[in-house]
Each structure stands twice: as C-alpha cells, then as structure tokens.
C-alpha cells in the first residue's frame, strides 16, 4: 500500500497554524523493517508518522513489550509526541515535529534509558540512524542499559565502526562505545551513542568500490569468560588470517564482571570505503575453534565480494544517508531483504537508482530533501 499523507490546521486565536504533514505507513508484513528503518529515518528527518496494520492479523497481535520499550525510548530520545504505543497496539503515531513545523529535537539533547530485560542493539541502530539528522552545531549523547548481547542475534546495531566512517563523510562526528557487557537473560550492560554535527551533509559520497583493506579489528569479550577460551579464539583467528591472506588483525578484549556468563566474538572489516561487521555470541563453555573459523570465513567472503558493505551494515548505511539528506553510491549483494528495504525507502520518498553488476547491485540513493 502506498504511503498516505494527512494534513490539518490548528486555530490559535484568529491565526490558523498549519500542522505538520503526517506520513501514514502500512506495516502489514514488514513490521520489523518499519521498526528497524522507517521510524529511525523519519526521526532523523523530523517527519511525523502514523503506523497502521502492525501485526494486525497474526496469532500474537500488535506491539510486543520489547517493541513498546524500544519505541518509547526512540520517542524520548527525539522528544517526539508518542500516541497509542502500548502492548498489543496495531495503530500508533510518533510526532517528530512541533505543530509549527520546527524540529522538536534540541541541541545537546540525549536520553538515559534503563532497559533491563531488553536488548539494546536495535535501539543503538535506531538512535544512530536518527542522529544522522542532526543539524549543524547540534550534538547529543545517549546512554542505554540492557542486554548488550543476545544469542542468535545478527550484527544489527553493532556496525558502529563503519557507520562512524560514513558519518565523517557527511560532516558528523559519531562514536558508539560499549562500556559494560550484559548477556541475555541475566546481565545488564551499557552502550553510549554520542554524535555532533560539524557541518551540513552537502556532498555526495561515492563508495561504489570498497577500495583497499585498511584493517581487520577483532573484539573478544564476555562476562567472567574463561581465559583459555579467549586465548584459543585469539590464536585460531591469528593463524587463520595469516595463513590465508597474510593479514595481522588488531585484537582487543572487553571483559566485565557480573553474574551472567557469556562470551562473544566480533569482527569488523575496515576498508577504504565501507566495511562489514560479523558477530557471534556463545555460552561460556562453547568450543572456540568453530566460532573462530565461522567468523574468519565470513570476513574473507566479504573481502572477496567487492561489495561496499555486508547486507546488514549496507542497509543501515542507506537509512543513515537518507536521514542525513545526503547522497550515497554503494555496491551491495542483491538479497530479498535489500529489495524490501529499497521498497520501503521509496515509500519514504527516497530516490533510488539501481544498476546490476556481477554479483552486486550498484545503488545511488538520495533523500527527498537532497534531490533536485
């Protein structure tokens, strides 16, 4: 269903003030993508939205408790007017602008959210994308507490290193840091998102080719992990990357004390233009060698693909460029999720040009405000 725009006016004394335009999005069949991409982009653009049909015909109807916590935090972080956001809701609104049409978000605005019992990675992605919409001279710092790592999770919300590099191209200073680890279902960790707009995103960013490999960063960590497990992980990664490609990765460890027991491995591939992130979360007693080999295989597969980003990082980067009103050219692996994301971005008014290449899809993406 194509997006619908709602408009009205508000009478104040004898003067009629036009309210902001509200985009209506039908979330049926694409609920996760609306949460992951549409709402953070609209928050960055300062565009109000009404979401309808959110899980309205499924066995479990409407917003889940975790989704409610996520949306309320996004609303707080952007000082939005949230209406109808409760467990089981199928229809809700987020007003990201004031009635006079000016942005609500103030300079140096930030949120401290204690989300014990909820994963923070999706929110890290939400607030990072929204931060790309900061105006020149504005800054913010968010601090989120909750599960920093969830088993079977994707790298959604972990792509901070690559997004920070893209942000610099768009005049934004961005830093995402994990300051304490917490694994589902017991621990609570802390992640901060800090952003400062140095200049307007005025130029197009041409990242059609990833360019040269700059580094591979490996982060090993956990809450009270077994030292021998991390030692074996590190040794296997060092050996695999050196024997196959003569690459020496930069390895760091992040260890927290707490009551939960968990370990994780994160590999960030840093290229001249773009990069990729792969994570694996395991129990304290998980065998380290399969974990290491899986991660190295993914990293080397990305390097051989000639893509600008992996799928998850790439779609997030496209969303960020639209939120910042910039223009971005990239090459991504064609996937069903990418196709769905492009369709959603078009519903938000983005202009997207596509060109096929061997094993890749070359894309040029411009937001409505940067087009023309």
Where are these regions (language model features)?
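Structural preference for solvent-exposed beta-strand-turn elements
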Residues: 2-372
């Amino acid at each position: 269903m194509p997006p619908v725009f709602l408009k009205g006016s508000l009478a104040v004394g004898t003067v009629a003030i036009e309210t902001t335009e509200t985009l209506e999005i039908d979330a049926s069949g694409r609920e996760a993508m609306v949460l992951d991409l549409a709402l953070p982009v609209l928050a960055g653009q300062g565009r109000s939205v009404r979401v309808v049909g959110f899980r309205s015909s499924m066995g479990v109807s409407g917003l889940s408790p975790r989704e409610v916590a996520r949306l309320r935090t996004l609303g707080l972080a952007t000082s939005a007017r949230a209406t109808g956001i409760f467990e089981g809701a199928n229809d809700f609104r987020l007003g990201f602008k004031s009635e006079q049409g000016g942005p609500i978000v103030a300079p140096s605005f930030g949120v401290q959210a204690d989300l014990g019992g909820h994963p923070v990675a999706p929110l890290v992605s939400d607030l990072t994308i929204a931060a790309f919409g900061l105006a020149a001279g504005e800054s913010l710092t968010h601090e989120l507490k909750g599960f920093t790592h969830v088993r079977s999770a994707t790298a959604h919300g972990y792509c901070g290193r690559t997004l920070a590099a893209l942000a610099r191209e768009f005049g934004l200073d961005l830093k995402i840091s994990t300051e304490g680890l917490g694994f589902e279902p017991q621990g609570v960790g802390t992640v901060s998102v800090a952003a400062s707009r140095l200049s307007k995103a005025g130029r197009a960013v041409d990242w059609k080719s990833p360019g040269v490999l700059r580094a591979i960063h490996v982060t090993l960590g956990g809450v009270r992990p077994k030292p021998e497990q991390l030692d074996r992980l590190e040794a296997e990664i060092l050996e695999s990357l050196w024997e196959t490609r003569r690459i020496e990765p930069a390895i760091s460890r992040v260890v927290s004390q707490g009551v939960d027991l968990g370990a994780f491995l994160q590999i960030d591939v840093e290229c001249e233009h773009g990069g990729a992130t792969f994570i694996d979360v395991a129990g304290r007693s998980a065998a380290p060698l399969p974990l290491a080999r899986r991660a190295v295989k993914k990293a080397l597969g990305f390097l051989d693909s000639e893509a600008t980003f992996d799928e998850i990082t790439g779609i997030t980067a496209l969303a960020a460029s639209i939120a910042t009103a910039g223009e971005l050219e990239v090459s991504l692996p064609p996937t069903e999720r990418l196709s769905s994301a492009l369709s959603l971005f078009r519903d938000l008014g983005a202009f997207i040009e596509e060109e096929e290449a061997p094993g890749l899809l070359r894309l040029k993406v411009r937001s409505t405000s940067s087009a023309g």
